[in-house]
């Protein structure tokens, strides 16, 4: 679900934290990607001309494999080294959000069934996309594909976006990539959004710098997390009637979520706290996420296993052999050279003074002549 309204708040108060650029501008970077999120995107976006998901002759869905294969190759061609991080066991506190998602899918199924044969193609597709979920089998297939491609995978003990942020904080990668804005609660130096979107969507990649974001909001790490909880996150519901502007204002006025809760309890306000609201437990999940220390993780990009790719993608999943071989060659070429260094990795940027540097009063005319 992410954090409702956080994107707009950062854009309003911390515009310098945002940058937009194309995939090629990430050349020379290593990036940790929330795998579950991008698999979900591929299942929704990678479709046939009639809007149906890609399937093989046996009727098995292959949209997730197609999206993962070709988008990863595109990154490697641009001299980017991706590492995919998969979700582990969800926190107990997330159970409520997962139950809501299940109920939404059940409702979408009912609405789709009610359409019968009278629904338009667009109406049917709308409900089909709401029914999409990433299965355990699809996760395992994606891991197998990435292993054959020579791309490293990491199994997070809990939330994938928290592990992505840990890899970025630990210097293993440049940034965490996810569509979930709550990734910022785990303090990655940079958050990348839209990284795995299809080029056909023509959406630039958004980069949000964490340090600039909270500086512009003029908040501490703890206040930023409280703001995200107040806006509504995966771990607990929001307070009815409190939108992004009000949430920001309340954090500024009261300083913390604890003080806001006390203020609501002790004053006649129009706000009602949810029953047994676990905001402090949610805060602890953001403050102390269950992750594997970055120093304990070794990331290695290897040459693709072409024979293995042909066996899995062509013989088992029904993809074109020519296309898989062509993709494997692109991977070989991209991974063989390693990540080229970026210029900003060799030079320190020094700001120029606004005024022209005045000549040293001790400097003699003769010394000026010698320099000419």
Swiss-Prot record:
Assigned keywords, A-Z: DNA damage, DNA repair, DNA replication, Endonuclease, Exonuclease, Hydrolase, Magnesium, Metal-binding, Mitochondrion, Nuclease, Nucleus, Phosphoprotein
Enzyme Commission number: 3.1.-.-
GO biological process: base-excision repair; DNA replication, removal of RNA primer
UniProt cross-references to Pfam families, sorted A to Z: XPG_I (PF00867), XPG_N (PF00752)
Provenance organism: Candida dubliniensis (strain CD36 / ATCC MYA-646 / CBS 7987 / NCPF 3949 / NRRL Y-17841)
Region (N-domain): 1-105
Subcellular location: Nucleus, Nucleolus; Nucleus, Nucleoplasm; Mitochondrion
Post-translational modification summary for this protein: Phosphorylated. Phosphorylation upon DNA damage induces relocalization to the nuclear plasma.
I-domain as annotated region, ranges: 123-254
Origin superkingdom: Eukaryota
Gene3D superfamilies linked to this entry: 5' to 3' exonuclease, C-terminal subdomain (1.10.150.20), 5'-nuclease (3.40.50.1010)
Cofactor: Mg(2+)
CDD domains the record matches: H3TH_FEN1-Euk (cd09907), PIN_FEN1 (cd09867)
Family to which the UniProt record says this protein belongs: Belongs to the XPG/RAD2 endonuclease family. FEN1 subfamily.
Function: Structure-specific nuclease with 5'-flap endonuclease and 5'-3' exonuclease activities involved in DNA replication and repair. During DNA replication, cleaves the 5'-overhanging flap structure that is generated by displacement synthesis when DNA polymerase encounters the 5'-end of a downstream Okazaki fragment. It enters the flap from the 5'-end and then tracks to cleave the flap base, leaving a nick for ligation. Also involved in the long patch base excision repair (LP-BER) pathway, by cleaving within the apurinic/apyrimidinic (AP) site-terminated flap.
Residues annotated as binding Mg(2+) 1: 34, 87, 159, 161
InterPro entries linked: 5-3_exonuclease_C_sf, Flap_endonuc, HhH2, PIN-like_dom_sf, XPG-I_dom, XPG/Rad2, XPG_CS, XPG_DNA_repair_N
Region listing for Interaction with PCNA, in residue ranges: 339-347
Binding of DNA, residues: 47, 71, 159, 232, 234
Gene: RAD27
Any one GO molecular function term: 5'-3' exonuclease activity
Key word Magnesium present: yes
Protein name: Flap endonuclease 1
Positions contributing to Mg(2+) 2 binding: 180, 182, 234
EC class of the enzyme, as a word: hydrolase
GO cellular component, one term: nucleoplasm
Cofactor info, note text: Binds 2 magnesium ions per subunit. They probably participate in the reaction catalyzed by the enzyme. May bind an additional third magnesium ion after substrate binding.
Phosphoprotein listed as a keyword: yes
